[in-house]
Amino acid sequence: EEISVVGFGDEGWSELTYPPLTILKRDVEGLSRRAVNMLFEKINTGHVIEQDYYADVELIIRKSTRMLDNGPFGEEAATPESIVITKEEKSRLRAGNFRVAISFHYTGTSWAELHEKGIRDELEQYGIDIISVTDAHFDASLQNAQLEGIRLQKPDAVIAIPADDKETKEQFRELAKVSKLVFLSSVPENMEKNSYVCCVSVNEIENGINVGRMMGQYCKGKHVEAGFIIHGAVFYGTRARDEAAEKIISEQYKNIDIKAIRGFGEIENAYQVCKDMITENPQIKVLYVSWDRPALLVIKALKEMHREDIAIFTTDLDYKIAQYMESGIVKGLSTQRPYEQGRTAAHVVAKSLLSNDVPKYVG
């Protein structure tokens, strides 16, 4: 049960095994079409296309894989599919007039928008109302004030991401007295295990490892000096991600020399942190940035310094960062699945409104 198994190929039987097999599915049809087009090109024109083509590969996740990360109290991660809502429970939910609030650490990104859409789409199935959505702008004091407002509304449940794992803990403890709490990605420090329902999380360690490996592949065969622009705040998700990226570079890619590691704390500080780092370490050729929003400010700083030769690796996908991937300054990116995570959190909330039989950690 502790071993994950991944298959390569798209054979039909992989879905029929127990458990169903997670696979890397190649776009064989697309590759075949390209081959036929090249053949007809040669027949019709005599021109031989000398170009390498690669089949696209899609990761289809099924139940043969499990998260390596554990919850705040060492819990193994349960799969979203393990939480089942019966027809009878659906009817009870629709008749229950339940109310839910959402407290985001910050919004204004595709990541947050997709989380909210996933939550809304899932809760709508059960007739559950969303009575408020707050944006703390990564300000713990502001989130505490917003949580007090939510507490006075007395929703049946709250889906929340703490802006700061330490500074918000007392307010979340008060909120837990009147509402069921489901956390996304992070649980405030020293929250008692029985004071919240569940933490729904992506594997941030794997997220960081993915970015580190992309950096390693990019720098393969050459000595490169790198800089790490990390979050540096009391926030579990980014801390786990940043540490994992740094660790895999240090342990597995000895050709990459990490010259500087600096935290920006608040997003707007990433611009100056980058400028200072590159001014002091002009030999840096590769930068890790904790996620896309600060990465956009790092790109702005690099452009002003005429250092677009520096390759950037980051996490989370938004329209602007995708444009920079196309132009080439962003060389690698690992992203979560925010819509699915939002739906899972809402699914957990719906189940918890009727039952205490909910896993403590889902991912």
What do the PLM-derived regions correspond to, one by one?
Residues 1-70, 306-363:
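Flexible loop/turn connectors
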